[in-house]
Amino acid sequence: YGFLSENAGFAKLCEENGIVFIGPKSEVISAMGDKDTSRQLMQQVGVPVVPGTEVLKDVEEAKKYAKEIGYPLLVKATAGGGGKGIRVVAREEDLADAFHTASREAESAFGNGDVFLEKYLTHVRHVEMQILADQQGNILCLGERDCSLQLNKQKVLEETPSPVMTEDIRRKMMDAAVLAAKAANYTNAGTVEFLLAPDGQFYFIEMNTRLQVEHPITEEISGVDIVKWQIRIACQVPLNMKQEDIRLQGHAIECRINARSTGRVEFLHIPGGGRVHFDTALMQDTVVVPFYDSMLGKLIVHANTREEAIRRMEASLCEMVIVGVETNIEEQLQLIRSKIFQKGNYDTLILDKILKKG
């Protein structure tokens, strides 16, 4: 919905009817929303991508390329997202089932069942770069967000800056994100997503041609109102900042508060205080139904250091009360208090282990 959604067909309808769409052009949404097309474009301009294939005709072709890439690998839908249309395959015997399942799932969810193969990288982090691009050709990068803490390929907690990012890797990844935006003729707000390997190598995985759920943590450390700039850029206002003007200050964390059940919110207490806020539409007596995304809101904290931000988030989670609907607040507390998180030594597969340990 709104700024958090992307639909090339809707953007095109706006263009055809003289309505200014706040976002990139429809053809850019189409191109970058297709993982195969965007992957090929990145290869052409020299942005590193994960080893993989183009769209595959059938299972037999997939088996042939799988032998070249090596197992484990991913079967990915070109139109996939949010964990849909993606399967991990550890051996050839499972490839056919994964191929058909991912294709059917993507066809049902996105109307496009095309799939391709990609090497499955282990012990990686999911790091994304926030960009703003105006209609005059200026592009800014507002730094990274570490979104590695995921359950079922759904983000649970995000932080910025990434606790493992060096200045050298950050600069290279920012340059790659700007290069990706230029190659796509991108305008407005967007996010370029990468996998970061333990050896410091990073690989483009996709570009989100919209505002991300987790954008507020970037706003906190950069002082840039991303949504305001989305509207200004759509009105052809040029960016009034240069890259060297962007000063990233402090550390910000976002915890997604999700419903674990349906029901009526009988009591609600939202934490307050300086540099703490809860983005939500939730109110007392709100009825949570099963038809939509389970996220109830985003708890965001900002502090001078990562350690202080962790303490502030822990206190805020302890203060938050939602009665009548089961939530993941206790799981978020468990995560924030874990030694693995506090050391910053985590990857995309670690959350299951943290929650199982208790």
Residue ranges and their predicted role:
Residues 1-8, 27-31:
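Short, solvent-exposed turn/loop segments enriched in Gly/Ser/Thr/Pro and often Arg
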Residues 4, 8, 15, 19, ...:
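ATP-dependent carboxylate activation and anion-phosphoryl transfer catalytic cores
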Residues 15-78, 85, 262:
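A conserved helix-loop-beta module that forms one wall/lid of the active-site cleft
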